[in-house]
């Protein structure tokens, strides 16, 4: 008997053409849809969830998953696009892709993608949070493998597996939305984690990495406490030191395991020049 693949969403899945954008940029979204129509809802996630845009009635079409997609990527065509608003603040943005007619509570009917918005100009009073997007992909088993199940190289050109970006509170414990990462038997929350994952059929590695586990909690706390936070990705740091220009403080929160040499060089230079990391 073939076991279901709980890393995937049956109705609609997708990912963006890039991980970060600025005001006025066009965000492209590449989807595989088994539903004839779906809607996209774009929400900034911080202390509050604020919906900023919707794209309704997107015509769905399926796109093939290549062999070794975890390594080679999907290579999907763009399905729809939208423009980042001039008034959208820096932050993490979730894209919900929900098939028409699917109930809100049914995970099979909606996939999720993400992107970040970079600020127009750096504000030295606002810390810059670098999302650990390299680590997201290292643990992302979508397409068959991750770095912990046999892959030696992984692609960013694919969706994130179900549960990385958004997970509901468990109905048996409304105050619990998933343990951070410790899955040892000695951890007092381990049993709750196992029950939570079993109840929602979440893949194992969603407890080890991902926005939902780590940065989401920090941003929610920081913004609620009155701290302004700008957001960027590992890619932004890898591409050059410009993302650090004008900053006093750069933050890494949670499970930030995978770095490139360029990332480290840029941070070292930032610290040598008086920045705080």
What are these model-predicted stretches?
Residues 1-11:
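Proline/serine/threonine-rich low-complexity linkers at boundaries of modular beta-sandwich domains
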Residues 13-48, 53-102, 107-117:
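Ligand-binding face of N-terminal immunoglobulin V-set domains in extracellular IgSF glycoproteins
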Residues 60, 64-74, 79-83, 87-89, ...:
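Helical hinge/lid and interdomain linker segments adjacent to catalytic or ligand-binding clefts
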């Amino acid at each position: 008997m073939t076991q279901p693949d709980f890393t995937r969403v049956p109705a609609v899945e997708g990912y963006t053409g890039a991980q970060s954008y600025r005001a006025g940029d066009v965000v492209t979204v590449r989807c595989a849809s088994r539903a004839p129509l779906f809607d996209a809802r774009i929400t900034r996630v911080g202390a509050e969830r604020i919906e900023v845009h919707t794209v309704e009635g997107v015509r769905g079409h399926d796109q093939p998953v290549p062999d070794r997609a975890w390594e080679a990527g999907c290579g999907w065509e763009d399905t729809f696009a939208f423009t980042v608003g001039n008034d959208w603040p820096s932050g993490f943005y979730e894209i919900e892709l929900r098939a028409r007619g699917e109930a809100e509570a049914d995970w099979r009917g909606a996939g999720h993608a993400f992107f970040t918005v970079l600020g127009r100009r750096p504000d030295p009073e606002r810390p810059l949070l670098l999302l650990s997007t390299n680590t997201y992909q290292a643990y992302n088993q979508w397409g068959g493998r991750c770095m912990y199940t046999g892959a030696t190289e992984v692609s960013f050109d694919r969706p994130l597996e179900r549960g990385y970006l958004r997970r509901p509170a468990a109905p048996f414990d409304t105050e619990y939305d998933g343990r951070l990462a410790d899955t040892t038997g000695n951890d007092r929350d381990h049993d709750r984690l196992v029950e939570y994952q079993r109840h929602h059929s979440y893949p194992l590695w969603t407890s080890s990495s991902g926005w939902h586990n780590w940065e989401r909690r920090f941003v929610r706390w920081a913004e609620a406490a009155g701290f302004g936070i700008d957001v960027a990705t590992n890619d932004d740091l890898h591409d050059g030191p410009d993302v650090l220009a004008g900053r006093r403080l750069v933050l890494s929160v949670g499970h930030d395991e995978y770095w490139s040499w360029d990332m480290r060089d840029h941070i070292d230079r930032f610290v040598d020049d008086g920045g705080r990391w």
